[in-house]
């Protein structure tokens, strides 16, 4: 998606999230260190969608969890980038490729960066249930597991 269109799309998503009552997570204490490590790895500038090891991880995650959709996402200071995904069609892949961090489900991994996060039911969990009120619904699945 062209940068201008992506920025407009993200602006609409932010507005929808605000109207729906989605509350962003505060940045963790080690945010600068976390972002410096992402920068050091150069991962935000790389397209990993064609790399076999990441595609295999998303496929295995789908198989093990029974989830139709799986993703590997990286949280930057303002955005979430999907680096590899499984089970999405071409349009869905375009939409999930980049989104505002403050409306992503993955942002909740930052609340407790020393622990994996498991949300059994995204539609009922207090942190994520308002996302379903966004036009088009922002929940790609019922379940989420994230690692900081």
Model regions and ranges:
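Regulatory sensory and allosteric helical modules in signal-transduction proteins
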Residues: 68-69, 75-85, 90-145
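Intrinsically disordered, low-complexity terminal regulatory regions
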Residues: 2-97
């Amino acid at each position: 998606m062209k940068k201008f269109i992506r920025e407009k799309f993200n602006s609409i998503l932010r507005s929808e999230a605000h109207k729906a009552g989605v509350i962003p997570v505060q940045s963790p204490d080690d945010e600068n260190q976390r972002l410096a490590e992402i920068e050091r790895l150069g991962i935000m500038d790389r397209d990993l969608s064609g790399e076999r090891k990441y595609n295999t991880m998303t496929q295995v995650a789908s198989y093990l969890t029974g989830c139709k959709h799986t993703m590997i996402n990286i949280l930057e200071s303002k955005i979430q980038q999907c680096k590899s995904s499984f089970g999405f069609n071409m349009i869905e892949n375009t939409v999930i490729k980049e989104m505002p961090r403050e409306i992503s489900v993955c942002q909740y991994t930052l609340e407790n960066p020393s622990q994996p996060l498991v949300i059994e039911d995204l539609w009922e969990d207090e942190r994520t249930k308002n996302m379903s009120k966004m036009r088009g619904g922002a929940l790609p699945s019922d379940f989420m597991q994230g690692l900081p």
